[in-house]
Amino acid sequence: MRKAVMVEGAAKPGGHYSHAVIADRLVFVAGQAGADPLTGALSDKFADQVRQTLKNIQTILRGVGCDMKDVVKVNSYLTDGSRFQEYNAIYKEFFPTEPPARTTIGCQMGGILVEIDCIALLPS
């Protein structure tokens, strides 16, 4: 089974892609940025973007019947690797125990400071 999903109330995609794709019991969440889902506004503050990005992921996961505890893998992209410790502290707010596997990469992105995608497992 493969199903592309758009979640009502989630931030609009910045391109031609689904919020997530469900394949069997795996949920592949597309890369999310820190845009406010109601206004599309993007804060210029790193911490605000990180929190909003993780909230956007949480909204998508809840829309398909998962939560942050169901995430098994995260890929994080930061424009400024020197902010890793700050990123990590905020990340721990959303994954306080048994965090998923994670890769964090420094890269250049137009206009956003952080992007995160993830894979979650649908509850049985």
Residues of each region from the PLM?
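N-terminal presequence-like segments and the immediate start of the first folded domain
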Residues: 1-72, 78-124
